[in-house]
């Protein structure tokens, strides 16, 4: 049941405590605020002027590369993928091998979870979840953000089938597991292309595999319609810290990618393509490639008329992995740009501050 105005906060209130009580502590999220029919965005969500998005920033008639993966190991496709990773950091793929029926079930399960009553979703909040690997929340890191983001999320870190069956929300668990299993072949193919063929790494052995794809995390993101979308963001400027991310988005749109080699502040809208998946390079692979592949700033704008969902699957190094350039990349005398960094330290650094563009990767720069 949707909350009523009488049951929650005075929307004219200035206190974060009232907003926090409703959004986070009671589990309504920003979806609950949207469902109240509020006409004015609470000031806690107002982004600084320099961070707000304008249509004037969009590079018209531009798009990220679209790649057909049906012949994924052909020289032409290998070149297209590696070029996209180097010059864009983002690309869309079709004929990727993940069944379209699986993708549809994932989207339906995402809507089912966020349609749950607040008290059910709140069972997975930071304060109530029985395990750290499953977390429902809003924004990014609210306790350190000066301006909150207009987004609710469910984050699930995969450890084992046993833990998943015990702790992941039953209303979406099976669909997310099916999606993760269906993505394994795609993940291996992308690693073969980007690392073995692109970076000339001899092989992905039992030592290197955990360094590249040692863990998985899946997020369910919900961006409700917003009364003043021009004042806030769904997600602020950032790059992912993953090796790479596989993103499923719905047909609404809203994801924008910063254009590389651009001296101005221009962005490219990632137009939804039915049946496609979006691949974006993460900081970890930028470090391991010594900067050849690029993790690119991206953001999600708020929408004033429609709700939006997305489901990123983060393919991450194992927390105990050491991030550093591959020796093969440096074999011809190339100087390392990045120092060795423990993956868990890098991740901890990312999650202790608000989204701030590409500044996280500076943590790994050589002194």
UniProtKB/Swiss-Prot annotation:
Cited Gene3D superfamilies: B-lactam Antibiotic, Isopenicillin N Synthase, Chain (2.60.120.330)
Enzymatic reactions: (E)-4-coumaroyl-CoA + 2-oxoglutarate + O2 = (E)-2,4-dihydroxycinnamoyl-CoA + succinate + CO2; (E)-feruloyl-CoA + 2-oxoglutarate + O2 = (E)-6-hydroxyferuloyl-CoA + succinate + CO2
Enzyme class: oxidoreductase
Protein induction: Induced by UV-B in leaves and petioles, but not in roots and stems.
Signal peptide start-end: none
Cofactor section: L-ascorbate; Fe(2+)
GO process annotations (BP): coumarin biosynthetic process; phenylpropanoid biosynthetic process; response to UV-B
Binding site for Fe cation: 238, 240, 298
This enzyme's EC code(s): 1.14.11.61, 1.14.11.62
Keywords: Dioxygenase, Iron, Metal-binding, Oxidoreductase
InterPro entries: DIOX_N, IPNS-like_FE2OG_OXY, IPNS-like_sf, Oxoglu/Fe-dep_dioxygenase_dom
Regulation: Repressed by the competitive inhibitor psoralen, but not by umbelliferone, xanthotoxin, bergapten and isopimpinellin.
Family that this chain belongs to: Belongs to the iron/ascorbate-dependent oxidoreductase family.
Function of the protein: 2-oxoglutarate (OG)- and Fe(II)-dependent dioxygenase (2OGD) involved in scopoletin and umbelliferone biosynthesis. Converts feruloyl CoA into 6'-hydroxyferuloyl CoA, and p-coumaroyl CoA into 2,4-dihydroxycinnamoyl-CoA. Has no activity with cinnamic acid, caffeic acid, p-coumaric acid, ferulic acid, cinnamoyl-CoA and caffeoyl-CoA.
Protein name as catalogued: Bi-functional coumaroyl CoA and feruloyl CoA ortho-hydroxylase Diox4
Organism: Ruta graveolens
């Amino acid at each position: 049941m949707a909350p009523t105005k009488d049951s929650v906060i005075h929307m004219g209130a200035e206190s974060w405590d009232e907003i926090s009580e409703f959004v986070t502590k009671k589990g309504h999220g920003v979806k609950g605020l949207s469902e109240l029919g509020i006409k004015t965005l609470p000031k806690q969500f107002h982004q600084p002027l320099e961070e707000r998005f304008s249509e004037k920033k969009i590079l018209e008639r531009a798009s990220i590369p679209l790649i057909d993966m049906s012949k994924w190991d052909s020289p032409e496709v290998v070149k297209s993928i590696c070029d996209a990773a180097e010059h864009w950091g983002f690309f869309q793929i079709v004929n990727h091998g993940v069944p379209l029926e699986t993708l549809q079930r994932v989207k339906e399960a995402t809507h089912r979870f966020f349609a749950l009553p607040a008290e059910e979703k709140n069972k997975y909040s930071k304060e109530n979840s029985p395990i750290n690997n499953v977390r429902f929340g809003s924004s990014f890191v609210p306790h350190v953000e000066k301006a909150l983001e207009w987004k609710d999320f469910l984050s699930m870190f995969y450890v084992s089938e046993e833990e998943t069956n015990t702790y992941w929300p039953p209303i979406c668990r099976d669909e997310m597991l099916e999606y993760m299993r269906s993505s394994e072949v795609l993940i291996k193919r992308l690693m073969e292309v980007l690392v073995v063929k692109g970076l000339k790494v001899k092989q992905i052995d039992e030592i290197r595999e955990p360094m590249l794809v040692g863990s998985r995390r899946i997020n369910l993101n919900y961006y409700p319609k917003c009364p003043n979308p021009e004042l806030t963001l769904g997600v602020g400027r950032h790059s992912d810290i993953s090796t790479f991310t596989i993103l499923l988005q719905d047909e609404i749109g809203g994801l924008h990618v910063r254009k590389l080699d651009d001296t101005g502040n221009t962005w490219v809208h990632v137009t939804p393509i039915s049946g496609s998946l979006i691949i974006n390079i993460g900081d970890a692979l930028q470090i391991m490639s010594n900067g050849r592949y690029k993790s690119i700033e991206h953001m999600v704008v708020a929408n004033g008329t429609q709700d939006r969902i997305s489901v990123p699957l983060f393919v991450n190094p194992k927390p105990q992995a050491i991030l550093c350039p591959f020796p093969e990349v440096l074999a011809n005398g190339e100087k390392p740009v990045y120092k060795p960094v423990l993956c868990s330290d890098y991740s901890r650094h990312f999650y202790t501050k608000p989204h701030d563009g590409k500044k996280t990767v500076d943590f790994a720069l050589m002194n």
